From Swiss-Prot:
It comes from Polyspilota aeruginosa. This is Periviscerokinin-1. The modification Pyrrolidone carboxylic acid is found at residue 1. It is found in: Secreted. One of its GO terms (biological process) is neuropeptide signaling pathway. The keyword Secreted applies. Its main location: secreted. One of its GO terms (cellular component) is extracellular region.
Amino acid sequence: QTLIPMPRL
């Protein structure tokens, strides 16, 4: 399972 943090807008 690969977790990718969402980029801050």
